[in-house]
């Protein structure tokens, strides 16, 4: 999910960048060159080079490559007796001399395949003591870059006079990380990217599940909490060296990002402003507030609060919902004022009318929302409901009971009223909740969240419902499959598809709302006109609005189709036809049947009969809601049984496919999936089950001492 992080906005001004790739990225575990990773690296640099970026590469790996080659050569020249003797470590300078040739030959070959010219520059720390060298270095690099050549730097370890330890008071640079930082200053780079074998800087060893990736390094916050693990299998300094080099460059005014070199497109993502890796920036200390509450901490807090909520009685949970309803009505003016500000901003930004329609809270909406919350508070208790009760054996009773899911993440667009519905359902079902609304409803969501959480008692905690305000946090949230139990995306096809592709957490929702109304030849035409008009114009932007009108072929001959068309056009509906309807009605042909207009427009097509209508729905629909209008009960039953959608209606508008209208009190969304919940999802869709066994000392012991009865006691319970 591509997005520009607010702290990465500086990338739009990047012209010259230095990319440093470490030995752990350049080589495989066996010491051989990692051809796949190097190929991906060169492809990224070629793409940037072609886009006008000035790209400089600093590479490690020569010593590692040389060591592997010399070990192989030594093995070939050793007798069996030689191999039994203790093996001495190969001289690093000799390894560097041998490996440099092979490493650069590979870079030259890869870049040549991409029509890019590269140049090798070997340097030592002593070189930088000479001002003339530094001036000449700048001249040479500037000349190469003007010719779109990619300079490749490496420390000339073969002739370096520096000895271990690599860092000392007299050194100018100590490894290729510090060389890259030094070059960034000398060559006036706009960005330094350090590629590692991990995703960035973690609060602890990356393999520790409690370690968290730090997206923006703030020295005052992170210096005292970070624990470094072992360095990589190769290379000199590991993450410690990278952090020191990054801080050196960042405090000199050059942003640095440490990220993984194992991914095939991380450099491109960095330059797109995506929130990957760890950013070091001279202004990072001003961004302490951007640290927000960590996504994991928010989810963990929501779970802790949900367990306290579950411990309350049914009456106490109902009282919370009643307090929320009262708070909504008491703050109606403030809510509507913030919503109006969102609507005005959306209009000025040029948003589509359908989005603005979903965004606006009309007069009376707050009262309606409050009433729906009260209805929910008066519904039967959903938790701890015994679904099945079985006597396993004498004195051994097993119950299947309803239980909360845990923590639910809802990502929704445009509609602030959805926040109220979702939050009230979470309270009723005993779940913790994480909410991420669209930026277009930022003010509305903030005030609604504040009003609702203020009504939650301290004994439960207002962190029961967390509001995520930054879009950049979504990728991090979607990684939390150990603390978030379900994701429900409510929005566009693109949003839902991206969410499903980006997480291991179960996802419940629908990608499209392509709803059909089929008017059969035996339909009551007055009823048909009322239903089709309502299904389209009652709320055109809703996911349960009609998007395709299917009409039996006989109605095209007896005037019924024309009556429907006139009725829709009179209401301002734009019509687009399928191949048959467009020629019959002289209307524009629809580009595709799989199109969700979300506005006063729909597709019309003529079909042979109910079976053709069913086939059309299965081929082009989204399994959301479909309706038939007919007086023929047999045809109606065929449609109801055979249409494989979450909701199938007879002689009713598709707009009834709604949690409130179904009597669910409210809904968190509509699911077109076939697992867990389907159709409008109310309280029951946020529940799972647990097994409760009450015994009297029973043991298995090979089933020798127990007599199973398996008696159903559900009705007796």
Curated annotation (Swiss-Prot):
Functional pathway: Amino-acid biosynthesis; L-proline biosynthesis; L-glutamate 5-semialdehyde from L-glutamate: step 1/2; Amino-acid biosynthesis; L-proline biosynthesis; L-glutamate 5-semialdehyde from L-glutamate: step 2/2
S-S bonds: none
EC number(s) recorded for this UniProt protein: 2.7.2.11, 1.2.1.41
GO cellular component: cytoplasm
Gene Ontology MF terms in the entry: ATP binding; glutamate 5-kinase activity; glutamate-5-semialdehyde dehydrogenase activity
InterPro entries per record: AceGlu_kinase-like_sf, Ald_DH/histidinol_DH, Ald_DH_C, Ald_DH_N, Aldehyde_DH_dom, Asp/Glu/Uridylate_kinase, G-glutamylP_reductase_CS, G5K_ProBA
Activity regulation, free text: Feedback regulated by proline.
Region (Glutamate 5-kinase): 1-296
Tissue: Expressed at high levels in leaves and is inducible in roots subjected to salt stress.
Region (Gamma-glutamyl phosphate reductase): 297-717
Keywords: Amino-acid biosynthesis, ATP-binding, Kinase, Multifunctional enzyme, NADP, Nucleotide-binding, Oxidoreductase, Proline biosynthesis, Transferase
Residues at which substrate binds: 60, 157, 176
GO biological process: L-proline biosynthetic process
Catalysis performed (reactions): L-glutamate + ATP = L-glutamyl 5-phosphate + ADP; L-glutamate 5-semialdehyde + phosphate + NADP(+) = L-glutamyl 5-phosphate + NADPH + H(+)
Binding-site list for ATP: 196-197, 236-242
Pfam families in alphabetical order: AA_kinase (PF00696), Aldedh (PF00171)
SUPFAM superfamilies: ALDH-like (SSF53720), Carbamate kinase-like (SSF53633)
Keyword hit for Cytoplasm: no
Entry function: P5CS plays a key role in proline biosynthesis, leading to osmoregulation in plants.
Family indicated by similarity: In the N-terminal section; belongs to the glutamate 5-kinase family.
Protein name stated in the entry: Delta-1-pyrroline-5-carboxylate synthase
Organism encoding this protein: Solanum lycopersicum (Tomato)
Record lineage: Eukaryota, Viridiplantae, Streptophyta, Embryophyta, Tracheophyta
